[in-house]
Amino acid sequence: MNKDIMKCFIGKVIRIDRGGPESRIGMLLDASDNLIVLLTEEDGVVYFKTSHIKSFTDNMKEQMEFNIKVPKDFKFKKAANFQDLLDTLKLKWIQINRGGPEKLEGVLCEVNKDFVFLVNNGEIVRLSMSHIKSISYGVKIEKAKSKK
């Protein structure tokens, strides 16, 4: 995905991919060299590695449901690239990938150019950087409450 094209959609609701465990609908918050930042209802802030994004869909007819009111002072981690993002998340509880057999959770304890090291339940998991599609780390916004 081209960073300059993605920057045109910041603040808009888009869908990442057409289906599958990594597909998400949310508001695009930022776009950098090889990552985008999406605020989703399910997972909060999710950082997607652009090399794994197959498509994105613009919400032109506003048919994609997104019921989160984003505060003006909402803060999230920004990074120039995916490696820099991972460096800022050391010693934090993260989730790698959204679902399926590739989903992992744990404390990010080490990052290098080839692998990340997660600790979870007494195990150290070494995961190849090439298999990381997305990361989230716990920043969430409550859904806007509808009046009944």
Sequence positions of predicted segments:
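Short glycine-rich, low-complexity segments
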Residues: 1-105, 109-148
